[in-house]
């Protein structure tokens, strides 16, 4: 399980250090794709396979299902950790998530998310303001 929040910088070549705490769970190769809320989702291979199966079961006749599957898979790439614990994030993914230099790497149970620090701070400010309401809204889902 992934949890915690870590701040790291992207270097001039687009490389980001993967927190040591997450490396073991992710393995040497894992999938990075466009996520929701302007961040990147990072999945270990086995978790990606489960997500892929679920998405493949969506009815291709529905326009919204096709659009989501295209969005999700077109942005996906396999990344490999180098000897210094870094990954090279492709330019298209850095642009999508507005990643420039300062980033926040967050553990979210079965996946890791990569955020620009500015977007993460903005998201957290909104979420904190409505945290109690969010909790009330989802309590029935638990």
Swiss-Prot record:
The record's listing under SUPFAM superfamilies reads:
AbrB/MazE/MraZ-like (SSF89447)
Location(s), subcellular: Cytoplasm, Nucleoid
Q: Does the keyword Magnesium apply?
A: no
InterPro entries documented for this protein: MraZ, MraZ_C, MraZ_dom, MraZ_N, MraZ_sf, SpoVT-AbrB_dom, SpoVT-AbrB_sf
User: PROSITE patterns from the entry?
Assistant: SPOVT_ABRB (PS51740)
Alphabetically sorted, this entry's keywords are: Cytoplasm, DNA-binding, Repeat, Transcription, Transcription regulation
User: What's one GO BP annotation on this UniProt entry?
Assistant: negative regulation of DNA-templated transcription initiation
A GO term for molecular function:
transcription cis-regulatory region binding
User: What top-level branch of life does the organism fall under?
Assistant: Bacteria
Q: Which GO terms describe its cellular component?
A: cytoplasm; nucleoid
Instruction: Report the Pfam families cross-referenced here.
Output: MraZ
Annotated SpoVT-AbrB domain ranges read: 5-47, 76-119
Q: Which family does it belong to?
A: Belongs to the MraZ family.
NCBIfam families from the UniProt entry: division/cell wall cluster transcriptional repressor MraZ
Per UniProt, subunit arrangement is: Forms oligomers.
Q: What is this protein called?
A: Transcriptional regulator MraZ
State the organism of origin: Desulforamulus reducens (strain ATCC BAA-1160 / DSM 100696 / MI-1)
